Amino acid sequence: MYTQTLYELSQEAERLLQLSRQQLQLLEKMPLSVPGDDAPQLALPWSQPNIAERHAMLNNELRKISRLEMVLAIVGTMKAGKSTTINAIVGTEVLPNRNRPMTALPTLIRHTPGQKEPVLHFSHVAPIDCLIQQLQQRLRDCDIKHLTDVLEIDKDMRALMQRIENGVAFEKYYLGAQPIFHCLKSLNDLVRLAKALDVDFPFSAYAAIEHIPVIEVEFVHLAGLESYPGQLTLLDTPGPNEAGQPHLQKMLNQQLARASAVLAVLDYTQLKSISDEEVREAILAVGQSVPLYVLVNKFDQQDRNSDDADQVRALISGTLMKGCITPQQIFPVSSMWGYLANRARHELANNGKLPAPEQQRWVEDFAHAALGRRWRHADLADLEHIRHAADQLWEDSLFAQPIQALLHAAYANASLYALRSAAHKLLNYAQQAREYLDFRAHGLNVACEQLRQNIHQVEESLQLLQLNQAQVSGEIKHEIELALTSANHFLRQQQDALNAQLAALFQDDSEPLSEMRTRCETLLQTAQNTISRDFTLRFAELESTLCRVLTDVIRPIEQQVKMELSESGFRPGFHFPVFHGVVPHFNTRQLFSAVISRQDATDEQSTRLGVVRETFSRWLNQPDWGRGNEKSPTETVDYSVLQRALSAEVDLYCQQMAKVLAEQVDESVTAGMNTFFAEFASCLTELQTRLRESLALRQQNESVVRLMQQQLQQTVMTHGWIYTDAQLLRDDIQTLFTAERY
């Protein structure tokens, strides 16, 4: 019964998708515009390029429906540990990890039962072959010395350049982890090399999801489970502006819009950073059309002063994601621990032991994480101890919950996710098409003189918008100056108070150094929390003020435009942008970690030292001071020197923080304002273009106008049917989802 219902729903989804494709083809043929020299060169929502994108979206949904494939898009920055997270989800290493961007092209990772060894299919390799030929010629002509100035040439890049010079093409098929790593690393290095040699990488050739590389492998966490109708596939997406390629943002947006669900990987230590903000904006742009989930990676770096899991969920759900995701869909995890633990358990189950660390480097990482930094090779021979350590590391990784709640659920309900994705895409398409066509149909019924008047009124609104933007900039600048002046005054107060507390603390030179360290850490943590709370409230208030100022300026223009259109008989349905908060969030916990000027930590041992502990260690020339079994320094410690040095570092930190505040607030607000006004102006320009096209069509002979009216009315009606049927489809799918939970 369940299978029959799925089949009927998939047939209905396919019917609606095919009907939508037919309607798009009709739209392409309709004479809805009259070309002229004064036509603005804009990427309008229903221009030919946009219609082509909608065709691609519908074709992609048809492809997923035919397979009943649920595509879970995974997005995150390089530093968030996206590749490690995917490896942890799959249960084995299918993506390479390097300390540089590794996803220049989207990559599909498809769960294939029985496929123990990963295999990569790269059928659409022809554009890469053409690129290699271009690069081959450029390498012959270029100055290698100049190339080294603009490109880091490591051994991988050197091998790729040699391969290009020899004319070695990419294969269409790679079997095994190492050949796959080599292929993916070479593709990403190819992007960097092409940029350095000023050759365009063929990103557009891989816009269609069927053209991107596909890795097929059995997901370890799904091995042995009963089979379900449907297929689960992960989509590794390029991060925003990855590898210095800002146009990857468009590719990312396209891939996210075509996914069945989106999983964002955020960095616990960088939750309020600019890079993670770009990821959040990308997934928020998808809206409510697909389910959203968040993995907060690197949660193993939490300490007693950091936000706990519930606080992280509340921060992301309420503040960072603006209520678009519930706390239940947010999972703090350690992807590295999860990957290492599961890899070790898998090796023990299949081979009875772990490989030698010299043969597979991940074993050393596992031992360090599970056994501690003092592990020995002999420890790996105690299989019962290793098995217990792997289980504990898996438990500590917190990965079991998202595996159960997300991966298992996605696998069991892949067909329903695919159908729900199609239903939501159909609803969005039909709604947008109906609003656009209804506007165009009504435009043919409005008198030419009235259309001219509407065009003139929109032109006046555009001019008023430009005038108001110049005027409001001064007011906003004044508000920013007031906020920064107040923030700097508060920062100086905290600086003075902290230095006074430090001076009082160091007066007692009889206190043991370990107790002094603890009290210093407490003082710094208290100051951090005070500044964090104040800045959160202070800049939330600034954000509200900016929104109010802009709303007061924009609302009269918006209301006037809508009223004038309504008087001409145009129905509401034209959406203007809404100004969102643009004041950056400041992670004072991270900033305070830099209060003491520290050496760049090169290993995990260094990063685990506390701020004050590391400072004392450096001053006493004892790198491991402050750990267990610490030894008291033999030399006399001059507390006055420590106090002066610590106070100097606090002063420097406060100065730097004030500078960062000014730069980031000004940059963020200016960019946000410019974007908002540009989007608002673009909406008005689009409206003006539609009205001009309606006027041009209205001026055609009466028989042509009547024919277009009939065509538009029929098309509007058809899209209304598509919308209604898509609503019914969505409701039926939701009923099945609800039934699956009980």
Swiss-Prot record:
Keywords linked to the UniProt accession: Chromosome partition, Coiled coil, Cytoplasm, DNA replication
Single Gene Ontology MF annotation: ribosome binding
Top-level taxon of origin: Bacteria
Region (G4 motif): 297-300
A GO-annotated cellular component: cytoplasm
Coiled coil start-end: 440-472
GO process annotations (BP): chromosome segregation; DNA replication
Chief place where the protein resides: cytoplasm
Region (G3 motif): 236-239
Localization, UniProt: Cytoplasm
G5 motif: region residues: 331-334
Region named G1 motif: 76-83
Annotated spans, Clamp-binding consensus: 41-45
Stretch list, region G2 motif: 102-104
Keyword Cytoplasm attributed: yes
PANTHER family: GTPASE DER
Subunit structure comment from the entry: Forms homooligomers. Binds to the beta sliding clamp processivity factor (DnaN) in the presence and absence of DNA, may bind to the clamp itself as homodimers or trimers. Homooligomers may be able to bind more than 1 clamp complex.
Function according to Swiss-Prot or TrEMBL: Important for the colocalization of sister nascent DNA strands after replication fork passage during DNA replication, and for positioning and subsequent partitioning of sister chromosomes. Does not have GTPase activity on its own.
Protein family: Belongs to the TRAFAC class dynamin-like GTPase superfamily. Dynamin/Fzo/YdjA family.
The name this protein goes by in its record: Clamp-binding protein CrfC
Species of provenance: Escherichia coli
